[in-house]
């Protein structure tokens, strides 16, 4: 053996090597991961020191079939084979453990001692080991970095945006901002005395680029409250100058440091005040006319076609998803309405959604109402929308995602083997899909059997058309036609 590291190009090649019975060490890596690059130095020196073993690299994201076969969820990741079997694994940047595990697999079979760190190659070995170890520890705290897939990145961004009630994605860190806009937002948050988390987007290009698409917001900084985008520097500055930022935090249950108000008090809603204290009769009449100008009326920042804050955009998205006609008013264009409506409704932030003149609430309440089905119920009760037939409901569900899976359980926790197989096949092809757990709704479960003329589950739909159940999906997967079928 040459003592060099080679790249694996196919699963078949790896299977042949593994079945040869020789010691094989596999390094799963990613080009964006600094820890992978650092551990690759160690890996190369080990290949020189242990010529009896095969040393191979696999770029995890370029060979998902290999990564999935060995349950690779993070890089760097190492798999050790001996006599055709997997005998050990290692996740993360740990040079000492890697050297010891390689020694056990590829060293002398009679040796009772594990490989010493100095086995990293000639006199330079210990120096290289310590340098790499310190670099890995300093930059990544010896943690593995998650393999980037569309679903994994989305999940990571959701966790990051929800990691603190107030979360700022910025250039640099609060103590040392690396752009004027980031510095300005940090100063504002400190001025309103609110605790906040932060993430330096300069340190992680995957997050930097991913967040632009995730939030549909192309620049930084980005400020999030309770997982929802508030906006960038301009919006944060404008809200702060008007006093609205502090009010928004209060309405969302985010209290400032040292505040005596409890979250319950801060989260109290509004409701149109009978007295409208402090409003002139003329303004009160104008506001009453505006909130009743359409059956469903949204007071927002910007227009439905161009929202000027993330919360307003979210409510517009919900109303469009529910196919609800609504009127809107841009409060940024009329400060009299903007300030007066806060008093009229006893609700201090925007957006505000009204149904037949009655305040429903802001973005967080509207979102919860949609999730629980309460929004549709209220609109039906008030005569805004008619009672939805089962057929219409099924059509809406089937078309809610381009690829839609009706299954038992959820993709992360399937409750039958057939559903699990289909989920695995879709994920194996990196197909994004929506899902519905038929165990949670007997009406949908029975109704869709008749609707589709298909008596079993799971059922997979593409653009509203039934593709089939588990057997058909597995046949398409095995023939290599699944992704093509779901992208025509």
From Swiss-Prot:
GO terms assigned for molecular function: 2 iron, 2 sulfur cluster binding; metal ion binding
Domain Thioredoxin: 2-107
InterPro entries: Glutaredoxin (IPR002109), GRX_PICOT-like (IPR033658), Monothiol_GRX-rel (IPR004480), Thioredoxin-like_sf (IPR036249), Thioredoxin_domain (IPR013766)
Gene3D superfamilies reported in the protein's UniProt record: Glutaredoxin
Reported modifications of this chain: Ubiquitinated at Lys-154. Polyubiquitinated by RGLG3 and RGLG4. Polyubiquitination of GRXS17 leads to its degradation by the proteasome.
Main location per the UniProt record: cytoplasm
Protein name, per record: Monothiol glutaredoxin-S17
Underlying gene: GRXS17
């Amino acid at each position: 053996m040459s003592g060099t590291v080679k790249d694996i190009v196919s699963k078949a090649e790896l299977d042949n090597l593994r079945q040869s019975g020789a010691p094989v060490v596999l390094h799963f890596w990613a080009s964006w991961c600094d820890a992978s690059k650092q551990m690759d130095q160690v890996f190369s020196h080990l290949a020189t020191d242990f010529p009896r073993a095969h040393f191979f690299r696999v770029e995890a994201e370029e060979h998902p079939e290999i990564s999935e076969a060995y349950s690779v969820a993070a890089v760097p990741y190492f798999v050790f084979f001996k006599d055709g079997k997997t005998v050990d694994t290692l996740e993360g940047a740990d040079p000492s453990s890697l050297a010891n595990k390689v020694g056990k697999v590829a060293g002398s079979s009679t040796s009772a001692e594990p490989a010493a760190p100095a086995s990293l190659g000639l006199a330079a070995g210990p120096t290289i080991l310590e340098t790499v170890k310190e670099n890995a520890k300093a930059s990544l705290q010896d943690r593995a970095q998650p393999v980037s897939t569309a679903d994994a990145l989305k999940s990571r961004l959701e966790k990051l945006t929800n990691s603190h009630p107030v979360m700022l994605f910025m250039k640099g860190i609060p103590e040392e901002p690396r752009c004027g806009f980031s510095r300005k937002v940090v100063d504002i948050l400190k001025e309103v005395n609110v605790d906040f988390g932060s993430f330096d987007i300069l340190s992680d290009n995957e997050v930097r680029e991913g967040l632009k698409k995730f939030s549909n917001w192309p620049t930084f900084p980005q400020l999030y409250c309770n997982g929802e985008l508030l906006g960038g520097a301009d919006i944060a500055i404008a809200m702060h100058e008007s006093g609205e930022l502090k009010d928004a935090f209060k309405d969302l249950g985010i209290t400032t440091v040292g505040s005596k108000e409890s979250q319950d008090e801060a989260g109290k809603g509004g409701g149109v005040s009978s007295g409208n204290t402090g409003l002139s009769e003329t303004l009160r009449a104008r506001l009453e006319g505006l909130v009743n100008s359409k059956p469903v009326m949204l007071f927002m920042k910007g227009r439905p076609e161009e929202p000027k804050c993330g919360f307003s955009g979210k409510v517009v998205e919900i109303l469009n998803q529910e196919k609800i006609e609504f009127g809107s008013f841009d409060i940024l264009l009329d400060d009299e309405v903007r300030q007066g409506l806060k008093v009229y409704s006893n609700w201090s932030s925007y957006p505000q959604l009204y149904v037949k003149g009655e305040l429903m609430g802001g973005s967080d309440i509207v979102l919860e109402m949609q999730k629980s089905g309460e929004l549709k119920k209220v609109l039906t009760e008030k005569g805004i929308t008619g009672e939805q037939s089962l057929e219409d409901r099924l059509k809406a569900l089937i078309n809610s995602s381009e690829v839609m899976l009706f299954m038992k359980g959820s993709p992360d926790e399937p409750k039958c083997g057939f559903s699990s197989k289909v989920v695995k096949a879709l994920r194996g092809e990196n197909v994004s899909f929506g899902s519905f757990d038929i165990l949670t709704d007997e009406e949908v479960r029975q109704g869709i059997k008749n609707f589709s003329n298909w008596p079993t589950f799971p059922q997979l739909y593409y653009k509203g058309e039934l593709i089939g159940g588990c057997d058909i999906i597995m046949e398409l997967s095995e023939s290599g036609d699944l992704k093509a079928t779901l992208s025509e």
